[in-house]
From Swiss-Prot:
GO biological process: vesicle-mediated transport
Keywords of this entry: Disulfide bond, Lipoprotein, Membrane, Receptor, Repeat, Transmembrane, Transmembrane helix
Transmembrane segments: 43-63
One Pfam family matching this protein: Ldl_recept_a
Name of this chain's protein: Low-density lipoprotein receptor class A domain-containing protein 1
Domain LDL-receptor class A: 71-114, 115-161, 162-203
Signal sequence, start to end: none
Keyword Amino-acid biosynthesis: no
Membrane topology: Single-pass membrane protein
Bridged cysteine pairs (disulfide): 72-89, 83-102, 96-113, 141-160, 163-180, 170-193
Subcellular location: Membrane
Family: Belongs to the LDLR family.
Amino acid sequence: MNKVFPQGENGYTAAESKAHPGGEAGGGHLCCSRRGACLSASLLLLLATVAALIALVTILGLPSCTPGAQACITLTNRTGFLCHDQRSCIPASGVCDGVRTCTHGEDEDESLCRDVPQSLPHFLVAHCGDPASWIYSDQKCDGTNNCGDCSDELSPVTVCPPCGPGWWRCPSTFFKYCDCIPRHLCRDHVQHCSDWSDEYACPGP
């Protein structure tokens, strides 16, 4: 007498199901599930790594790779140095002056100050008529003889604007100034202009 096995909904008998426990019907789903779990774990690990790197850059305030990204314009409309907080703009002459002005001290960083002016970004440096002399870029066209030969004020390459309202134009007798003197020096009974115009023509401040 033949033994009859009950049939399931899919037409397979119970014996056939037991005879193939690792067949395609069950084993394929298990393999796919394991592969999906591995992919999910790898993706989560990658996302966690990226998030950690972003947090590190944000916390430590790592510097920009390009020196040009550190340039800015100060409140006095002069070239400045942008601190790593991306908010503080300090004067060019405040870089490598021995005083840490930026929060993280990047304005006094060894990479900037190890061989001044060669180690400074180009936007912080202005060259004088004497090739051996240089000044900070914010000292150009400020009315003061910073180069010593007035090339930072009178050179055709410099192209400085005319004397401002707080200045009097004349050939100065003082080494500190070039072709303009501050108006507060007018009519102080001291000759500041070679033509004495500071005492007789300048209306004063």
